Design a protein with these regions (language model features):
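Short loop/turn segments immediately following the C-termini of beta-strands
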Residues: 37, 78-79, 88, 120, ...
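A short loop-to-beta-strand structural motif that recurs across blades of beta-propeller domains
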Residues: 40-44, 81-85, 123-127, 165-169, ...
Length: 283
């Protein structure tokens, strides 16, 4: 678990979205989900509406999230060593049948509905196939407290290897693991791809977010100021990048055309994970 994650709790408060200038919600035309780590809740911020608490029961220190095409929300219930599913149709919460988890954090779903879980304290990534064939351990080498996960357009898996200060790529075809060419990473956490295939990582130990172009160009620093242990990442439908600014108790929006603003949700306490519906991300 990232050193930034604080073992404390506080009551949640919410505020109507919008800004002092009367602009619409920063997240555009799709809901934004935020896991509030210290308050043990997940919030849903709809376009043009007020934030509401997702009906997930018994959460302790929620972190990573993923949404499937049916609107089902997967939540890494880190403190309870499990992953829960909140159905999009309002049905009862269920627990993913994953055995032996210890501090699960990052989640990712592939096009077939298979779920990947960063089983952090077990130093592994596990896969729960959608066909019910049973849990498997993804073949990786040397992971230490894996954190964020992401999948590219061809199904390759990327893992933020937190203690080893690197991001690794696990090819979908079973080829050998490689290290992604980021430089000077410190405690990487969240991962996300934009629609161009550029890979973004929360470089939490350096209080910044990095971007690695898909065309092989050099890494760049995302122009977001004042970050303190950034965590989860997500893209909105208009291409804006959203950053869970963990130790600043806020979510930051970085629009495609530049600038920065704080997403209007009051009362956050160490936001960790972010998610938007599939197919609504990117540029």
């Amino acid at each position: 678990m990232a050193a930034a994650l604080l073992l404390c709790a506080a009551p949640i408060a919410s505020a109507a979205p919008g800004t002092a200038e009367g602009r619409p919600p920063a997240h555009g035309g799709a809901p934004l989900y935020i896991s509030d780590y210290a308050d043990n809740v997940v919030l849903r911020l709809p376009p043009g509406g007020a934030p509401a608490t997702v009906a997930a029961s018994g959460l302790t220190r929620p972190t990573g999230m993923a949404l499937d095409s049916s609107g089902d929300l997967y939540i890494a219930d880190t403190g309870n060593n499990r992953v829960v599913v909140v159905p999009g149709d309002g049905g009862p919460q269920t627990v993913v049948p994953a055995a032996g988890l210890s501090r699960p954090i990052g989640l990712a779903l592939n096009a077939d509905g298979d779920l990947y879980i960063a089983d952090s304290f077990n130093d592994r990534v596990v896969k729960i196939p959608a066909d019910g064939s049973g849990q498997v351990t993804v073949p990786t080498n040397g992971l230490l407290h894996p954190n964020g996960l992401a999948l590219d357009g061809t199904g390759n898996l990327y893992v933020a290897d937190f203690v080893n200060d690197r991001v690794v790529k696990v090819p979908a075809d079973g080829g050998p693991q490689t290290t992604v060419p980021f430089t000077a990473l410190s405690q990487p956490t969240g991962l996300a791809f934009d629609r161009r295939g550029d890979l973004f990582v929360s470089d939490s130990g350096n209080d910044r977010v990095l971007r690695l172009p898909a065309d092989g160009g050099p890494q760049r620093v995302v122009p977001a100021s004042g970050l303190n242990s950034p965590y989860g990442l997500a893209f909105g439908p208009a291409g804006a990048l959203y950053i869970a600014d963990f130790n600043n108790d806020r979510v930051v929006e970085v629009p495609v055309r530049g600038g920065q603003r704080t997403v209007p949700v009051a009362g956050l306490h160490t936001p960790a994970g972010l998610a938007v519906p599939p197919g609504r991300e990117g540029y």
